Regions:
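RNase H-like (RuvC/DEDD) metal-dependent nuclease/polynucleotide-processing core
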Residues: 2-248
């Protein structure tokens, strides 16, 4: 076990949203310990008793002030890396103002009013608004160093030697490939977590994605994570000062 000041003797966490809350994976490199659980909301996610040094969240954190076709620069860069068909898993985020909407019609109106070329919203994106709003209320520029936006398919891209996983995560073959990649990268107990938590409402895909997010959180803590846009380019910020970036 590492000493108290050992950089490996801390927890990091990854989280993936599902209908009833969040599935959270915590990992401690010093002991190789991994924990997995579900929590109800953002307050619980961001006040975990393990006090993780970094939390990688598969959810948009830096929403743009004006929505654009194709989303933010980081969304477009992520799709370019992943190619077709994995790039379709990166969706365009709503404008910040659309997070205040209570109905789909209002969200559409607010999103389209955010900029000259602003598109409407998909129903899938609208259903994410409660989680996006809760994150937006918590994350400040200062807190963004701890709470980071990640994308599981980008994590698997990095694990897979900078190559997208060919198989869909919704197939048995795709799940097998992703489980094998995670096992190679320190998450040998993944199958136990899937068996314990996946119950129909929470799917095996969600548990696998949360492990991928945790892997990127570990890389962030170690200083080895990469990002979209590339680190050679300065990440743009929105009006609230949040960086619009996706880590892997």
């Amino acid at each position: 076990m590492g000493s108290p000041d050992d950089s490996t003797d801390v927890w990091v966490a990854g989280a993936d949203g599902f209908r009833d809350g969040w599935v959270v994976v915590l990992h401690r490199s010093a002991t190789g310990t991994t924990r997995c659980r579900t929590v109800d909301g953002v307050d619980a996610l961001l006040s975990l008793p393990e006090s993780p040094a970094v939390i990688g969240i598969d959810m948009i954190i830096g929403c743009p002030d004006a929505a654009e076709p194709g989303g933010r620069a980081c969304d477009r860069a992520a799709r370019q890396l992943l190619g077709h068909p994995r790039g379709t898993s990166v969706f365009s985020p709503p404008a910040y103002d659309a997070l205040q909407a209570d109905t789909y019609a209002e969200a559409q109106r607010r999103n389209r009013a955010s900029g000259p070329d602003a598109p409407g919203l998909t129903k899938q994106t609208f259903h994410l608004i409660p989680k996006l709003r809760a994150l937006a209320e918590y994350v400040t520029p200062e807190r963004q160093d701890r709470v980071r936006e990640v994308h599981p398919e980008l994590s698997f891209y990095a694990m897979n030697g900078d190559a997208p996983v060919a198989e869909s995560k919704h197939t048995d073959a795709g799940r097998a490939v992703r489980r094998a990649l995670l096992a190679e990268h320190g998450f040998a107990d993944l199958d136990e977590a899937v068996s314990a938590l996946a119950d129909g409402v929470l799917g095996a895909d969600d548990v696998i994605d949360a492990h991928a997010a945790c892997w990127t959180a570990r890389r962030l803590h170690e200083g080895t994570a990469e990002r979209c846009p590339p680190r050679s380019d300065e990440a743009p910020t929105n009006a609230r000062g949040l960086r619009m970036e996706i880590l892997r």
